[in-house]
Amino acid sequence: MLTKSVTSILQGITLAAKEFENNEAGARESLIAHSRALISALEVPSEFIQHTFWSQPALSAIIRLAADVNMFQHLKDAAGKGIDCEALSMKTGVDASLLSRLARHLVAMNVITFQNGAFHGTDLSDSLAAENYQHSIRFCHDVSRPSFNEFPEFFKSNGYKTPTLSGTDGPFQAAHKTELTFLQWLVNTHPYLQYFHSYMSVYRAGKQNWCDTGFYPVSERLLSGFDASVSDVVLVDVGGGRGHDLETFASKFSPLPGRLVLQDREQTIASMPADESRQFEATAHNIFTPQPVKYARAYYMHSVPHGFGDEDAIKIMANLVPALAKGYSRVLLNEIVVSEENPILAATNMDMIMLAHLAVKERTEAEWRYIFTQAGLKVVNIYSYPGVAESLIEAELA
């Protein structure tokens, strides 16, 4: 058997712990991966089944309920002293007998704690009290989970084949009883578009960003070669939602030598609140039409082409080509590049999300290079950071 021994896993944990203490890149993720491997090596099959089909589904359902009754907010408000079951029952409106059972499972799953007759929040549960995480909980439970639950029946009915790339006949449509694509459904089903954007805003929270030190060399590859006589635009975020990535970029490199431009669907741009302090321009743009901003230093996309099949992904990339200044403009794709030999959980998680919602997939390096080549571009380099699922693919005109 190729399964790692408990001894070798423990050795890996010891090494990763030392790296973590020294704040080495990827140490936290390595510790988590080794810890998961240890559990897998120690669990007997019955424990694995109970954990997979009882513990985790119950946990996600309780957390979704907790979002409805503001449980984590109340626990956070009681920081230090904690809150007993009767008082928490009064604040949440959940019967004390039921609440005690639900909360005990959260304690068993290390989400909250119980000490001296009172429930206490943790760093994790306090974080989950924030609005963007509350929205994320609702999105993942209400939208994603039913799509995963549909896998067995859907794939049985279609003969265990990959869904068509139309995006209108997959597990998501079967689960939500709709003929709309995932994105169309979000736009038409309030408030899930807002929840989705909140989820995307926290998707990489706490992880290294593409423009952080040690990831992509922004100053060397982007800013140092900026030429305002070619274009006064430094970076165009194509399909950038509400501008979370541009905000991060601006906060790290201001003052910038040129403009930042955000592009997304008209509905998304229209939903953005007015903000005079915003450091970028927000404009509506359809990614299936030619890029209107010409000769910018860079055109950036975060998790955009991965939501489409090869044909559409090539069209999206090709629409950038006429706007590029040869030898100057760069195309930057912040995407998962799946390792065929050592896939990490964060990458396969997103691949399953793509399968469930959009009938598409995360791509390997060879598959990404094919997309770029077919669009008239060439990959210059692929930048990665230890423990981070997404890479930064830099390309230019072929």
From Swiss-Prot:
It is an enzyme of class 2 (transferase). Its EC number is 2.1.1.-. Keywords: Cytoplasm, Methyltransferase, S-adenosyl-L-methionine, Transferase. Disruption phenotype: Results in dramatic reduction in MPA production and leads to the accumulation of DMMPA. S-adenosyl-L-methionine binds at D264. The active site is at H306, E335, E362. It catalyses: (4E,8E)-10-(4,6-dihydroxy-7-methyl-3-oxo-1,3-dihydro-2-benzofuran-5-yl)-4,8-dimethyldeca-4,8-dienoate + S-adenosyl-L-methionine = (4E,8E)-10-(4-hydroxy-6-methoxy-7-methyl-3-oxo-1,3-dihydro-2-benzofuran-5-yl)-4,8-dimethyldeca-4,8-dienoate + S-adenosyl-L-homocysteine + H(+). GO terms for biological process: methylation; mycophenolic acid biosynthetic process; terpenoid biosynthetic process. Pathway: Secondary metabolite biosynthesis; terpenoid biosynthesis. One of its GO terms (cellular component) is cytosol. GO terms for molecular function: methyltransferase activity; O-methyltransferase activity. Belongs to the class I-like SAM-binding methyltransferase superfamily. Cation-independent O-methyltransferase family. COMT subfamily. This is O-methyltransferase mpaG. It comes from Penicillium roqueforti (strain FM164).
